[in-house]
């Protein structure tokens, strides 16, 4: 019986012994997302104004001012900006004092609360404005059209463009990039 009591005491002592200390390791997991801005569908749209002169041969401002297009884009940085640069409608045919071959206008690009503008009569791009986190439509429209001399319009094709730029803030909290 002593052997049985001794065995029971040994078994109890073995189970009551403190466990070995546990050791843990930790692995941190991290990643990042770069500030980016993108246009969907290659960032391209067309404003086809059709006939831009009145029956009397002068510029039809209403036809030009009706020009509108929609771009789709996004920016994932809270300090992203947007600006516009408008280039006049030009006919490469030579004009004379009685005729105009240029149409000037104001271009506006509206994305949420941001609405930068540029006039074709001003050199360079218009002022950049904050757009922040943005995903959606950018409505581009034309207004305030005019021809330099309010003269008759030269017949032919007129070509211009409106460049809308979305810019991320790649400095992560610094100053946004400036318009060219």
What are these language model-derived features?
Residues 1-6:
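Bacterial N-terminal signal peptides that target proteins for export
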Residues 8-9, 19:
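Cleavable N-terminal signal peptides
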Residues 15-21:
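Sec/Tat signal peptide C-region and signal peptidase I cleavage site
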Residues 21-97, 128-180:
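N-terminal small/polar-rich segments of proteins
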Residues 101-109:
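Short, surface-exposed beta-strand/strand-loop-strand elements in extracellular ectodomains
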Residues 113-133:
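Extended, solvent-exposed segments with strong compositional bias
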């Amino acid at each position: 019986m002593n052997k049985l009591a001794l065995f029971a005491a040994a078994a109890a002592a073995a189970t009551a012994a403190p466990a070995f200390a546990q050791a843990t390791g930790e692995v941190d997991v991290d990643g990042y997302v770069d500030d980016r801005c993108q246009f969907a569908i290659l960032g391209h749209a067309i404003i086809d104004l059709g006939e831009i002169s009145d029956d009397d041969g002068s510029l039809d401002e209403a036809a030009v001012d009706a020009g509108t297009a929609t771009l789709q884009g996004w920016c994932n940085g809270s300090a992203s900006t947007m600006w516009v640069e408008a280039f006049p409608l030009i006919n490469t045919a030579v004009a004379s004092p009685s005729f105009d071959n240029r149409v000037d206008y104001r271009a506006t690009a509206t994305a949420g609360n941001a609405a930068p503008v540029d006039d074709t009569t001003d050199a360079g791009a218009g002022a950049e404005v904050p757009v922040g986190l943005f995903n959606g439509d950018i409505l581009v429209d034309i207004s305030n059209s005019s021809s330099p001399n309010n003269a008759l319009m030269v017949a032919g094709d007129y070509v211009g463009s409106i460049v809308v730029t979305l810019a991320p803030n790649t400095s992560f909290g610094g100053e946004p990039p400036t318009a060219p």
